[in-house]
Amino acid sequence: MSKAMNADNPEPATKSVAAIAPSLKAEILAEALPYIRKFHGKTIVVKYGGNAMTEEKLKHGFARDVILLKLVGMNPVVVHGGGPQIDEALKKVGKVGTFIQGMRVTDEETMEVVEWVLGGEVQQDIVMLINQYGGQAVGLTGKDGGLIRAKRLQMPDRENPGTFIDIGYVGDIEAINPAVVKALQDDAFIPVISPIGFSDDGQAYNINADVVAGKMAEILKAEKLVMMTNIPGVMDKKGNLLTDLSAREIEELFADGTISGGMLPKISSALDAAKSGVHSVHIIDGRIEHSLLLEILTEQAFGTMIRSH
């Protein structure tokens, strides 16, 4: 059964770790030890998006957090979004982003923008920061090593069952070849994946980053999938945080419209990952500094846990 947490104040508790008392820091480090043992050698897929990608302090904190996970023996794989950056780039060419059921309508010009923003600007920024702090990150798109093979998405028209909506060059994942990711992991690198897929004839497709993260977690047999967002987690219609959701409860939230817009692909992908065998799937508030470490290395209840049963 879902547990609701009151969210009268939707702003995150952005207390910096630097402000925590030394004794509490020691407790946190001691608390992390069993989790470090538990997840040693395990793959952790992180969907990186929202404010954590645009606020400088959070960006630098995320880079350090990912490096720490690698240093203590885990295998983090980062799948990044970049919606705000794409919107900003589209404005410069006189276009406005349009979304249907949480998916960006992608014409030919928009696809070109998506490719150079995600596969270039955003990816390079993440890789640079991780490497700047002493990590070894390598950026990938779906073309590298045949990582993500995609076809044009057929989006069902909910108002006209049996028909489909054309949303352009939006991709549906046909297959993921994890060989290049596993090779990088074996050589102590941190893969940073842009959600761009390619068809056999070389056509690029814009794929929702949540969808890529969920499928990547499934194919890599990840221990955990953590999705970072701009909200505390899944909220009910009264603004309360739902800390634990089963498959049945998620279907009810879809049906009554509680989950809508950009949350649709996010929750669908999270649930699919849980059903596929990913042991732990969480949606967390990326606006909280070091939220990734708090989720993985402490007992602190955080965000929304997605269960397959």
Swiss-Prot record:
Biological process according to GO: arginine biosynthetic process via ornithine; L-arginine biosynthetic process
Location within or outside the cell: Cytoplasm
One Pfam family per UniProt: AA_kinase
This protein's record includes keyword Transport: no
Pathway(s) of this molecule: Amino-acid biosynthesis; L-arginine biosynthesis; N(2)-acetyl-L-ornithine from L-glutamate: step 2/4
Site note Transition state stabilizer, residues: 47, 266
EC identifiers of the protein: 2.7.2.8
Main localization of the protein described in the UniProt heading: cytoplasm
Catalytic activity as recorded in UniProt: N-acetyl-L-glutamate + ATP = N-acetyl-L-glutamyl 5-phosphate + ADP
Broadest EC class assigned to this enzyme: transferase
Binding site for substrate: 82-83, 104, 206
InterPro entries, alphabetized: AceGlu_kinase-like_sf, AcgluKinase_fam, ArgB, Asp/Glu/Uridylate_kinase, NAGK-C
CDD domains attached to this UniProt entry: AAK_NAGK-C
Keywords: Amino-acid biosynthesis, Arginine biosynthesis, ATP-binding, Cytoplasm, Kinase, Nucleotide-binding, Transferase
GO molecular function terms noted in the UniProt entry: acetylglutamate kinase activity; ATP binding
GO cellular component: cytoplasm
Family classification: Belongs to the acetylglutamate kinase family. ArgB subfamily.
Role, per record: Catalyzes the ATP-dependent phosphorylation of N-acetyl-L-glutamate.
Protein's name in the database: Acetylglutamate kinase
Species name: Cupriavidus metallidurans (strain ATCC 43123 / DSM 2839 / NBRC 102507 / CH34) (Ralstonia metallidurans)
